[in-house]
């Protein structure tokens, strides 16, 4: 009986994931408020059903009380966040919130399957991060001072990376973090956010060549410190954020092209300088033949293949034998027991989140906020690409974790912080839209108030005849009046953008 339930559950889980992913993209393009509300409600029901089915199956398989505890804690978090956001931040993006809850649900499910202790540790970090970051949307919305701290962001980011380079301990061939009183901190996760804020502040008003050079020098210092720490995966994330922000700010293709050329040359140099980079390239070329170097990639590929399209079912596979399955290779563990179709939907869900962030960036009227959203979205997409691309042998492994899914406190905190900033930007854009809508309605009311009452009663043909007669006598005055009645082109465009934004 238990085996039948397990086998049926994997098809139901796959179906729920497919429906949630499709609904996520549908909500992005849906303009009707009521229909989008129904989509969001259906998504919440799917999240609850998926958690219930997965944790129920795991309890049937193991019979551990800790599984029930993790289910209750996960449900308390998801429902609590949904309720609090709707009470406090009514203008927040519920699409982004639902995507975050689904990704966190997948994380809690697979971590509970692999290690209940790590799942509990991850949950504590998640809860603390959410509480700490709950005020971030207010700071972004009201904090006009954020755009004036440009060089503080630069100094703070360089200082954090320098501390790790000097005092950090080596893991996987790279200096990634420092340890204080038994607690590990990966400061590069915070530095990638401060770098984006620095570049946005530097280029928010003046995107001249001089400011581009300043931004390039500071970004290069960040990247060079990471290279010296042999943390090349994070260095690539920083570099991609730099390239995209520079291009969006200047609209000049030569800057990213020069940057990509320099990065290509740096990759070649890194290959000859660092032995762990050569080992990862060798594993990428032949994971089976280089089993003596590491079995991570080969075990991950075996796990995904053994799961097939629908997976083996929870506790029916062996993802626990994959090295670092809770971190770098968590995507392989998910595909093994939940299926390749589930994994494809996970990729599409991450893509939906990225598109949503980019859409928010495009709707921002102020360049500072636009560049922040664009930079953070680029970092998120780059992390997803590096993690999944490395585990499926598309690119060499980089040691980057999957945001919101992989085990890791610093990564979890920085991602929750990043999404809280994005929510603040979305709320700010909604405020701007409402303000412009009020101005437009006020303008219409004033125009209606200033129109003579006789003009409303006059028939169209009489009005036309009257304008013809008056036009011949006072053509200049009529022309000036007509010019005054024409709306300003800039204001018309702003109103049009506001209307589209409100629909979106």
What is each PLM-predicted segment?
Residues 1-17:
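Hydrophobic transmembrane alpha-helical segments in integral membrane proteins
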Residues 18-25, 81-83:
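Alpha-helical transmembrane segments
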Residues 22-39:
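Membrane-interface helix-loop junction between the first two transmembrane segments
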Residues 35-39, 188, 211, 316-317, ...:
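Membrane-interface alpha-helices at helix entry/exit sites of multi-pass transporters
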Residues 63-293, 332, 336-390, 417, ...:
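Hydrophobic alpha-helical transmembrane segments of multi-pass inner membrane proteins, especially
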Residues 281, 429-440:
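Short, Lys/Arg-enriched, Gly/Pro-containing loop segments at transmembrane-helix junctions
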Residues 287-331, 340-342:
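TM-adjacent membrane-interface loops and short helices in multi-pass inner/ER membrane proteins
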Residues 393-434:
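Transmembrane alpha-helices of multi-pass inner-membrane enzymes
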């Amino acid at each position: 009986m238990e085996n039948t339930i397990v086998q049926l559950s994997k098809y139901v889980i796959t179906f729920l994931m497919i429906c949630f992913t499709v609904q996520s993209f549908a909500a992005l393009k849906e303009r009707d408020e009521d229909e989008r509300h129904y989509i969001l409600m259906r998504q919440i029901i799917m999240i609850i059903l998926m958690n219930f089915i997965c944790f129920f199956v795991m309890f049937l398989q193991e019979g551990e009380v800790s599984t029930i505890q993790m289910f209750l804690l996960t449900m308390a978090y998801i429902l609590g966040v949904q309720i609090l956001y709707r009470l406090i931040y009514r203008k927040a993006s519920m699409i982004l919130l639902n995507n975050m809850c689904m990704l966190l649900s997948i994380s809690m499910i697979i971590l509970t399957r692999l290690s209940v202790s790590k799942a509990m540790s991850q949950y504590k970090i998640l809860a603390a991060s959410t509480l700490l970051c709950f005020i971030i949307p207010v700071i972004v919305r009201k904090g006009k001072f954020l755009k004036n701290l440009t060089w503080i962001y630069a100094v703070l980011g360089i200082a954090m990376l320098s501390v790790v380079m000097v005092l950090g301990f080596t893991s996987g061939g790279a200096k990634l973090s420092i340890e204080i009183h038994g607690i590990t901190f990966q400061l590069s996760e915070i530095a990638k956010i401060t770098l984006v804020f620095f570049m946005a502040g530097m280029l928010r008003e003046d995107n001249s060549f001089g400011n581009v050079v300043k931004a390039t020098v500071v970004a290069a210092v960040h990247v060079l410190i990471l290279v010296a720490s042999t943390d090349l995966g994070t260095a690539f994330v920083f570099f991609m954020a730099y390239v995209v922000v520079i291009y969006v700010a200047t609209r000049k293709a030569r800057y990213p092209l020069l940057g990509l050329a320099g990065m290509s040359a740096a990759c070649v140099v890194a290959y000859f300088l660092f032995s762990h980079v050569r080992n990862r390239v060798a594993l990428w070329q032949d994971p089976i033949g280089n089993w003596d170097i590491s079995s991570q990639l080969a075990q991950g590929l075996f796990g995904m293949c053994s799961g097939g399209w629908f997976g083996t079912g929870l506790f029916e596979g062996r993802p626990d034998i994959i090295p670092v399955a809770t971190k770098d290779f968590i995507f392989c563990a998910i595909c093994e027991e939940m299926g390749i179709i589930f994994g494809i939907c996970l990729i599409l869900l991450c893509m939906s989140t990225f598109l949503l962030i980019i859409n928010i960036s495009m709707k921002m009227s102020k360049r500072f906020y636009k560049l922040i959203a664009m930079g953070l979205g680029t970092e998120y997409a780059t992390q997803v690409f590096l993690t999944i691309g490395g585990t499926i042998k598309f690119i060499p492994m980089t040691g980057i974790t999957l945001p919101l899914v992989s085990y890791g406190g610093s990564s979890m905190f920085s991602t929750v912080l990043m999404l809280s900033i994005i929510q603040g930007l979305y709320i700010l854009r909604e405020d701007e839209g409402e303000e412009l809508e009020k101005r437009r309605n006020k303008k219409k009311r004033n125009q209606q108030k200033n129109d003579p009452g006789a003009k409303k009663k006059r028939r169209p043909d009489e009005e036309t005849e009257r304008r013809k007669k008056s036009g011949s006598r006072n053509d200049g005055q009529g022309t000036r009046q007509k010019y005054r009645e024409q709306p300003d082109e800039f204001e018309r465009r702003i109103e049009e953008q506001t209307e589209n934004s409100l629909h979106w």
